Amino acid sequence: MNVALRRAYELERKGLEFYINSASKSNNALVKRTIFSLAKEEISHMMKIDEISSSLDASGKWIGEEIGFKGSDIEVEIRKFFEKTDKEILDASKDNTDLIKKAMEFEKKSYELYDDLSKKAGSDIEKRFYDELKKQEENHFDALQNVDYYLTETGDWFEKDESNVWSWMNS
């Protein structure tokens, strides 16, 4: 595995470990579902990194043009859970904001790593791959931020960029 992919893989592995450990500490159903959804996406990222690494090891080439992450839409998954779960359950035990903040920091570090790797990429396909991972980490951050807004019920919700706010949580 090349150095950049190894760094990416290790970061995703640490994220998975963090999310699995964090889920067991949460008493809030929304936080727990969000954390498990993020853990699932970390596994998806690790699998894609491993797939690319295997291709590089075997042929010295990045795999074809298909580098995206299929079915990776955390907002859709959280929305489905949110809409089918009683408000009492969603609002129970809103004490996990510190866990959410730590997760947001982790996603920010992930974004920064992929931004750096994208800038140092040796090919267009490698750059696109790291840019896609950056986008994924940004989506993860937005998910965590929206859950944090929901849990803390801060007025900050309305001051943020509308494109990042899940207004359906506030209805």
What are these regions (language model features)?
Residues 1-171:
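Non-heme di-metal
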